């Protein structure tokens, strides 16, 4: 160190230095998120000492509030909460709703045991699973896989009938009417099929429809598509048009052409269908520097219901 007789004291977790201080005595060391120092006197050189007996502690509601404030500036597709605290659940639900309504940032919360969230941005996990080694995971623990699977799915993919890795059964088991009731209530449920656990239907918790928010919004594939389009168009506008393109007919036509080209790519990848250039309009806004974009799209969903008619002659 630069200080004579002083030592660099590093806290290493998982091979990474998470805290480093320079001190001569124990009293000069400050507690960090991992270690609370004790003792007195001068420090002595050591090549490292493994610590044990620590505890993770239990996060308080304020910790979750701080966490949400910390992640808000970032872009993310899925937020997972694997706890049962109803206060935290309510805060998480309110958070993703506000991001969509006020910030134009579209993400989904994945949690378990919520009480009728009824929102397209909330996925409510009902099922636990039994793994091949006999371990039983609660619905809260299933949020880990479900959240990762939802975040990893593309806008042209559905998780309906997707298999849960190494799972052989579900907990609790449901009857056929139980599955119907759960799906009707907007719950994300799993079922066992010949020793393989699968997603019954890739849906969110939305169950109350309006003129604007209709049945297709209940499907997570549709939500992924809409979120992708909204986020991509914003990014395209931000990267290449804000402060660069004139807000006149020519400038607006340039932006429309870019959007049309983008949506044609989405259509080629089976995200939307029956799209035509006339389905996009870019108009001047009320302010001199504003534009208004209107899109009309028809999402493509995956086949989930097959009706067979047999005629006997």
Positions of the model-derived regions?
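Surface-exposed assembly/interface segments
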Residues: 1-313
């Amino acid at each position: 160190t630069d200080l004579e007789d002083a030592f660099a004291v590093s806290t290493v977790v998982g091979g990474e230095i998470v805290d480093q201080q320079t001190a001569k005595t124990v009293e000069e060391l400050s507690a960090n998120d991992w270690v609370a120092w004790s003792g007195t006197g001068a420090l002595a050189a050591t090549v490292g000492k493994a610590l044990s007996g620590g505890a993770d502690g239990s996060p308080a509601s304020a910790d979750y509030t701080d966490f949400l404030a910390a992640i808000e500036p970032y872009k993310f597709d899925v937020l997972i909460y694997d706890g049962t605290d109803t206060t935290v659940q309510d805060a998480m639900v309110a958070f993703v709703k506000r991001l969509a309504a006020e910030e134009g940032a579209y993400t989904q919360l994945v949690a378990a045991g919520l009480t009728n969230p009824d929102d397209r941005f909330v996925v409510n996990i009902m099922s636990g699973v039994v793994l091949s080694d006999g371990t039983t995971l609660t619905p809260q623990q299933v949020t880990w896989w479900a959240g990762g699977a939802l975040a990893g799915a593309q806008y042209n993919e559905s998780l309906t009938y997707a298999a849960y890795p190494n799972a052989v059964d579900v907990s609790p088991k449901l009857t056929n009417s139980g599955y119907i009731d759960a799906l009707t209530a907007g719950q994300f449920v799993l079922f066992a099929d010949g020793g393989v656990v699968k997603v019954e239907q890739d849906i969110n918790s939305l169950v109350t429809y309006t003129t604007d928010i209709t049945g297709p919004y209940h499907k997570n594939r549709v939500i992924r598509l809409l979120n992708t389009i909204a986020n991509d168009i914003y990014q395209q506008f931000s990267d290449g048009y804000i402060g660069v393109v004139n807000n006149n007919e020519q400038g607006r036509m340039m932006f429309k052409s870019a959007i049309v080209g983008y949506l044609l790519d989405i259509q080629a990848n089976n995200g939307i269908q029956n799209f035509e250039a006339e389905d996009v309009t870019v108009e001047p806004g009320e302010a001199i520097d504003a534009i208004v974009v209107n899109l009309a799209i028809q999402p493509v969903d995956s086949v989930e219901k097959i009706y067979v008619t047999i005629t006997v002659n």
